[in-house]
Amino acid sequence: MNDINFAVLGTGGIGRRALEFSADKDELTPIAACDRHGVAVNHDGLDVDELLAATEGNIASDGGTTVESGGDDIKEHGDDKGVVASTQAEPTETPIEDIIAEHEAIDAVLIALPNLEHDFIPTVAERFANAGYEGVLVDVLKRSRVIGMLDDREEQLEESGITFVCGAGATPGLLTGAAALAAQSFIEIEEVEIWWGVGLKSGYEDNRGTVREDIAHLPDYDIESARALSDEEIEEIVDAHDGVIEFNDMEHADDVLLERAGICDAEDVTVGGVLDLRNDEKPTTTTVKVTGRTFDGEVGTNTFELDDDTSMEANVNGPALGYLKAA
């Protein structure tokens, strides 16, 4: 297999773990990474250990607001902020453009940015296409409606030579694929239920984008209102749930992707789960249940479970990097 030089956009919880995960993949070499305020580039390969150590507990803003800063600051430890704390990095006000400027050296890009505006990820893809990038873009986006926005750019992406792999994490991603396989026992699908459990003892501080995006799925919230929440307000929501938040009927793109694969109608797919921000142990087992009718008239349910010891980071980044290599 050919060696793949890749970049990571976003060094929050998902981005950091992707860099760490890649260290065990000899064929993957991270050569660039950025957050809102800094960019690190080394065509020979980033020193991942140094970058992770420098940014530990110093993760860039997720795009929401803070009471003190109005949205421009990030959590600070010492004089430097986020990626800039690394000796490999430089401060910048145009991090994505700086990565795009290196596109000739980059085979693939993992987009690990919070999708707190519906068209944000599609717009990022468009910017790579406009720059003449030829390669792979992999995203772990969640929202169903974003798939259609990417469709609107399909011709442009193809003409540029970009392969865009969307929904490449756990849900959508790994669990969507499991549902598609489990569905093969049936000639007609009645229901697909995806129920996930995630434990993140590191809490909101180190998983800001993930938590903020999930809060947007709660009753009385949406992308716009979740984006407007301050860090303190999100902490209050977490505290009000004693650190354990349950989600139902989430707008995850598993529904659209399964419909496009000819598995079932999007309306027959439900996604929900439980997020524990006080413990690393999963609060519930991640499960996929596919109910359908077999060719001989029986109605049954195939069930697929993830082991409770496989973390969210492993189940998101493993598939994402796998798709990145395969594409």
Describe each model-derived feature in a short phrase.
Residues 2-4, 135, 190:
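Nucleotide donor/acceptor-binding cores
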Residues 2-130:
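N-terminal glycine-/serine-/threonine-rich beta1-alpha1-beta2 phosphate-ribose binding loop
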Residues 9, 184-306:
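Active-site-lining helix/loop region of Rossmann-like oxidoreductase modules
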Residues 36-38, 141-143, 169-170:
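Short, ordered loop/turn segments at secondary-structure junctions
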Residues 115-164:
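Rossmann-fold NAD(P)-binding glycine/threonine-rich loop
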Residues 146-207:
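A contiguous active-site-proximal alpha/beta segment in oxidoreductase catalytic domains
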Residues 296-327:
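C-terminal helical cap and adjacent loop that interface with cofactors, partners, or active-site loops
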